[in-house]
Amino acid sequence: MKGSGKDENKRAPMYWSTDADATGMCDGSKDMDEVKMKYGSLKEQENDGNSIYNFVKQTIALRNEYPVIARGKVAFDEGISDDTVCVIRKTCDEGQLTLVFNTSEKAQTVDFRKSALGATEDRKYPLQIAGELLTGTEAAVLDEEQLTIPAYSVVILE
């Protein structure tokens, strides 16, 4: 892992460009190990919609759009979560959201009729897709009470 080990490695500089002499580039600490960043420079990632840079940017935008993600009380849905899918409900004064995480390399289908949390007076199923964090071009599909979520993705339902 980059930034692990000795202290100097934890201060490795960001690769702003592939050009080592570009404005903003620095060498880092003299005692830092030579490292090659896994995801490339910012300049390379900015125009790639599937880059780690854009994934983090989208993650922050969704967190800012839905404060309940950061502030909400968590309820784990044991009824529909398993080894590859995690479903949680976040609740606070700002509202309520359901977050679905697919940690597998294949699309998964979640049946909300099996939810351990169930519907509440103000939380009826089916829900609506409010946001997605995708790692590819395939989108999530909500069909009545079943959600098909692409590999390595997160879906926010409201």
Please provide the spans of the model-predicted regions.
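A generic, residue-level signal for flexible/boundary positions that often mark functional hotspots
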Residues: 8, 63, 136, 141-143
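C-terminal beta-strand-rich structural cap/linker in extracellular carbohydrate-active enzymes
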Residues: 139-158
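Beta-strand-rich binding/interaction modules
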Residues: 69, 107-135
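Short helix/strand-capping connector loops at secondary-structure junctions
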Residues: 35-37, 133-138
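A short acidic, often aromatic-flanked loop/helix-cap motif at beta-alpha or helix-coil junctions
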Residues: 21-22, 135-138, 154
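Loop/helix patches that line or flank the sugar-binding groove of alpha-linked glycan CAZymes
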Residues: 1-109, 117-118
